[in-house]
């Protein structure tokens, strides 16, 4: 979650919300940028990951649903691949009633281009950036992220790796094995 330099508490979005563990906090306008412009080449399927069916629903719909249902999220900006805008509008956004999706925009050549395209469309406030092919985001993650940003001004959701990770040099020779306790995936 990013905090742009022009963060303001909007008059119409300054409601008080409960904080985890008790207490309250003033709600700042929040935008979720959901990235769904990837082609999933590494996966090797004909259908992009975000559109694969999971329990009869596209994977992307689960990500959108979590942000749609969160009282912390005011709007969603959906970033999709070129030419997929209308498909996403009709087959996902309208079909599943994701009314918080305010804009469907085209992604860029690389992930960071897609993020930048989304950021250019946001209003002032806090911004969540989420990979639409990761369907297991939930209210707890969203709320904890919000609380972390209020305290620390930036945050990334992640978890420790379970696998052994190796660092290689330019010749693909293992040069290091970092301790797992220092390696997280985000």
Q: For the regions a protein language model found, what residue spans apply to each?
A:
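N-terminal glycine-rich phosphate-binding loop and ensuing alpha1 helix
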Residues: 27-85
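Residue-level signal for inorganic ion chemistry
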Residues: 34, 60, 118, 130-131, ...
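Acidic helix N-cap motif at the loop->helix transition within catalytic regions
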Residues: 86-92
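Conserved donor sugar-nucleotide recognition element shared by glycan-biosynthetic enzymes
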Residues: 111-115
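Active-site nucleotide-sugar/metal-binding loop of Leloir-type enzymes
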Residues: 116-126
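Short beta-strand-to-loop acidic/aromatic patch adjacent to the donor-nucleotide binding site
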Residues: 125-133
């Amino acid at each position: 979650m990013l905090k742009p330099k022009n963060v303001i508490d909007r008059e119409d979005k300054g409601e008080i919300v409960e904080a985890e563990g008790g207490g309250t906090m003033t709600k700042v306008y929040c935008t979720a940028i959901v990235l769904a412009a990837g082609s999933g080449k590494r996966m090797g399927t004909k259908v992009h990951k975000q559109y694969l069916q999971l329990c009869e629903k596209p994977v992307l719909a689960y990500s959108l649903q979590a942000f749609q249902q969160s009282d912390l999220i005011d709007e969603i900006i959906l970033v999709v691949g070129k030419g997929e805008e209308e498909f996403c509008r009709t087959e996902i956004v309208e079909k599943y009633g994701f009314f918080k999706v305010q804009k469907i925009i085209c992604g860029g050549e690389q992930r960071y281009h897609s993020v930048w395209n989304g950021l250019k469309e946001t209003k002032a406030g806090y911004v969540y950036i989420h990979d639409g092919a990761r369907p297991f985001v939930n209210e707890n993650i969203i709320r904890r992220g919000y609380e972390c940003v209020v305290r620390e001004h930036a945050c990334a959701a992640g978890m420790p790796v379970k696998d052994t990770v190796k660092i290689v040099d330019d010749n693909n020779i293992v040069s290091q094995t970092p301790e797992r306790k220092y390696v997280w995936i985000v």
